[in-house]
Amino acid sequence: MAKKVVTDLDLKNKKVLVRVDFNVPMKDGKITNDNRIVAALPTIEYILEQNGKAILFSHLGKVKTEEDKEGKSLRPVAARLSELLGKEVKFVPTTRGPELEKAVDELKDGEVLLFENTRFEDIDGKKESKNDPELGKYWASLGDVFVNDAFGTAHRAHASNVGIASNLESAAGFLMEKEIKFIGGVVDNPARPLVAILGGAKVSDKIGVIENLLTKADKVLVGGGMTFTFMAAQGQEIGKSLLEADKVELAKGLLEKAGDKLVLPVDAVVSKEFSNDAPFHTVSADSIPADEMGLDIGQATIDLFTKELQGAKTVVWNGPMGVFELSNFAKGTIGVCEAIANLTDATTIIGGGDSAAAAMDLGFADKFTHISTGGGASLEYLEGKELPGVASISDK
């Protein structure tokens, strides 16, 4: 990649600012999933091995008012990171000022500091989220070099990524490098055949991705709630299934443009209610009863998608095939997950979000070449958009 990577920087005795993505789920002040912290370890450990001083920062959730601060402190993250690294992580409960500056000045080579949630700066005028130039300059003044390892926020131009990068020599961390290699590779130079599997509820969320991938992929398999808008566009009866009526014309246009590249489900698991307790059965995709709704793809579609995947050299999957939170309607997502996991000769990529969660919950995480850490960022990358957080990293 043409962007600098952390290994291109001289880190010895340097104060290294690191934008990590520690936006982890919390419940009652406890971290419920530390995947994102674990994902940042290679970059942090490399900086420490090189005798750099690691100054870490991240956002956590949305913070708009003083009340929002409750439960949004990164203090529990510092404690967990300390356990994972096997060394003390100094926590500074502020985002600017003398306390932070003193802690940074006193940091020794090979030591780690984490300062408070960058979005605490959003309470007074959205300084972080609107990329306030003074804030970016201030944070940049705390370090000698900047490493951006937060792919999850790469689609946003914030003070903590773009703002700092415009004031300091910067490089991608190992996680960011991996994301650019795999997600970027799908868009720029995939091994063929490239098969994309897109799920999720709304066509509107995935229009850009479908349009872009129809020009890149050899096949695009569509599942999830958005299939019903496509079926309606073909004149099929979809009962009470999810429909974006204002997107039917658009779906028609996509179907015409796609020809046989776009593959839709041939059956659906339907029920009268959006519930795990209601009776359910499988019907052909063109005969969904008027009083029922499709909540998953059926076995015939799983078999069809499995067949379409055979021989693929690159597979990218984004979005579940049904309401996978309800066990009765999770079989489609599990089936697709298994089909991709069983491909031995392909680069297999999950584009973050719900599909990543599904693969991890099902124990398939190690069967994929790459599971993206960024939901929105992956989607925008797959749409072919330039990501500000990536664009702002120094070129080699």
From Swiss-Prot:
Subcellular compartments: Cytoplasm
Reaction catalyzed: (2R)-3-phosphoglycerate + ATP = (2R)-3-phospho-glyceroyl phosphate + ADP
CDD domains xrefs: Phosphoglycerate_kinase (cd00318)
Pathway: Carbohydrate degradation; glycolysis; pyruvate from D-glyceraldehyde 3-phosphate: step 2/5
EC numbers for this chain: 2.7.2.3
Chain residues that bind ATP: 206, 294, 325, 352-355
Pfam families in the record: PGK (PF00162)
Taxonomic superkingdom: Bacteria
Gene Ontology biological-process annotations: gluconeogenesis; glycolytic process
Binding site for substrate: 21-23, 36, 59-62, 119, 156
Primary location: cytoplasm
Keyword tags: ATP-binding, Cytoplasm, Glycolysis, Kinase, Nucleotide-binding, Transferase
PROSITE patterns xrefs: PGLYCERATE_KINASE
GO cellular component labels: cytosol
Listed GO MF terms: ADP binding; ATP binding; phosphoglycerate kinase activity
Top-tier EC class: transferase
HAMAP family documented for this protein: Phosphoglyc_kinase (MF_00145)
PANTHER family attached to this UniProt entry: PHOSPHOGLYCERATE KINASE, PHOSPHOGLYCERATE KINASE 1, CHLOROPLASTIC-RELATED
Assembly description: Monomer.
Family per similarity comment: Belongs to the phosphoglycerate kinase family.
Protein name: Phosphoglycerate kinase
Record lineage: Bacteria, Bacillati, Bacillota, Bacilli, Bacillales
